[in-house]
Design a protein with these regions (language model features):
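Short amphipathic alpha-helical coupling elements at transmembrane boundaries
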Residues: 27, 37-41, 89, 119-123, ...
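Helix-loop-helix hairpin linking two adjacent transmembrane segments in secondary transporters
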Residues: 225-249
Length: 308
């Protein structure tokens, strides 16, 4: 019954497309026979394999930045009193909901060559706004789009940490940064890696952002699309080979992540959740300003779309 239906759906929408993809990748466009020429062509020409290097580089940078931003935000949101916390969390979730190309389009309207902010700074202060095109633009858009994955994962994990562990560490003289590095981070590492995998997969597969603001910084999804729609008829097999390489890369990263998580994961039960503290003085002001600023910048794509 249900199991058979699930198997049919799984085979129809996952196994068959993957089988067709790899079959096409290993097929000679002219003879239709088995061939490795598509893969040889990819790795022989720098124009093609450079797109793989670019994809891996930008994806790694996006993932690293998302981990830093998302984990830091989750730490302060979980352990300190934040005014309008619920509203902040709603905005974080909303910033995650829109497609990445909306973010790229919005940043073009703001900071593109004829963008609102670009023209304002140029006409008022004669200041040339930094280009949002190329690697830097892709990094900006994808990081602001994807760090909420890390935040949501880590914020959930922070709630399951037992305060007894923190108190035990403090009684042994472990506090501040050392406490975070030696107690909290190891406890949430599996969760961080799970969120990082989501960020990595989304950044690697994203097509809209580099298509709109890449400008010469070629990445695999854009290259695959360009080859597939090429007017020359034999490019579909080559595009399939490039897609197969992406599948192999992402599958390898997935298995590596699962291996590391299985070695580092352990059950946690929060009998006494960690207490929320009230930060005071200038540090409290700085914390609120930075959190609000980050969320406001993350919401720019949605606000621009609404405004325009």
């Amino acid at each position: 019954g249900v199991t058979a239906l699930a198997i049919v759906i799984f085979g129809l929408f996952l196994i068959y497309p993957l089988f067709s993809l790899f079959a096409s990748a290993f097929q000679n466009a002219e003879t239709g026979g088995f061939s490795l020429e598509n893969f040889v062509r990819f790795f022989e020409r720098k124009y093609y394999y450079q797109s793989m290097i670019n994809s891996f580089w930008v994806t790694t940078c996006v993932t690293a930045l998302a981990i830093v931003i998302g984990t830091t935000l989750a730490y302060f949101m979980s352990l300190y009193t934040i005014k309008f916390k619920n509203a902040v969390e709603i905005c974080i979730i909303i910033s995650l909901l829109s497609p990445p190309f909306i973010g790229a389009y919005s940043w073009i309207l703001i900071g593109g060559r004829s963008g609102i902010l670009t023209q304002f700074l140029q006409e008022t202060f004669h200041y040339e706004f930094p280009s949002i095109y190329g690697f830097a633009g892709i990094l900006l858009v994808l990081t602001l789009k994807l760090y909420p994955f890390i935040y949501l994962y880590v914020a959930g994990a922070m709630k399951s940490i037992d305060s007894a562990l923190i108190e035990a560490a403090e009684s042994l003289g472990c506090s501040g940064i050392r406490k975070v590095a030696t107690v909290i981070v190891p406890l949430i590492t599996p969760t961080i890696l799970a969120g990082a995998l989501m960020v990595f997969m989304n950044a690697m597969a994203d097509f809209g952002t580099p298509m709109l603001i890449g400008e010469g910084f070629n990445v695999m999804p854009v290259m695959i699309y360009s080859e597939f729609i090429n007017e020359v008829g034999d490019q579909a097999n080559f595009a399939a080979a490039m897609a197969a390489i992406m599948v192999i890369i992402t599958s390898t990263i997935f298995m590596l992540q699962k291996y590391v998580v299985n070695r580092k994961s352990f059950p946690m039960s929060s009998l006494r959740p960690m207490q929320v503290h009230q930060m005071t003085g200038i540090r409290n002001v700085i914390m609120h300003v930075l959190i609000y600023a980050l969320v406001a910048v993350s919401m720019i794509p949605q606000l621009v779309v609404i405004y325009t």
